[in-house]
Regions:
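C-terminal extensions
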Residues: 1-12, 16-95
Length: 95
C-alpha cells in the first residue's frame, strides 16, 4: 500500500476510539495527520472534552503522527507503548 493510499484506520495503534478522537479533532486523512503536532492534538482533545485525558492517548497520537510522517518508521516505534516508555523516561516525544 502506498503512503497516499493509507487510511487512519491502517495505522498501527489506532483503534475505533482513536478514530473517534481524530474525528473530534477534525482529522480525516493521513495527510492531515502528517501536518499535526501530537502534543497540540492532546491539548486540544483535553480542552474539547473538558477533562484531563489519559496520557496514553498522547502516546497513541505520537505513534500515529510519526507513522503519518514516515511510512517506513521502525515497527517498534509504531506501537503506542514505545512512546509511553519514552514519555515516562522524561525524554522529549516526537512532534
Amino acid at each position: 500500500m502506498s503512503a497516499e493510499e493509507r487510511q487512519l484506520k491502517d495505522l498501527v495503534s489506532v483503534g475505533p476510539a482513536m478514530l473517534e478522537d481524530f474525528e473530534l479533532l477534525g482529522i480525516k486523512t493521513v495527510a492531515q495527520l502528517r501536518r499535526r503536532s501530537a502534543q497540540r492534538m492532546y491539548q486540544d482533545l483535553c480542552s474539547l472534552r473538558g477533562e484531563h485525558v489519559d496520557p496514553c492517548c498522547l502516546d497513541v497520537f505520537v505513534a500515529a503522527v510519526a507513522q503519518a510522517k514516515d511510512p517506513a518508521l521502525p515497527v517498534e516505534q509504531r506501537q503506542w507503548w514505545y512512546w509511553s516508555k519514552v514519555r515516562k523516561r522524561g525524554a522529549k516525544l516526537r512532534d
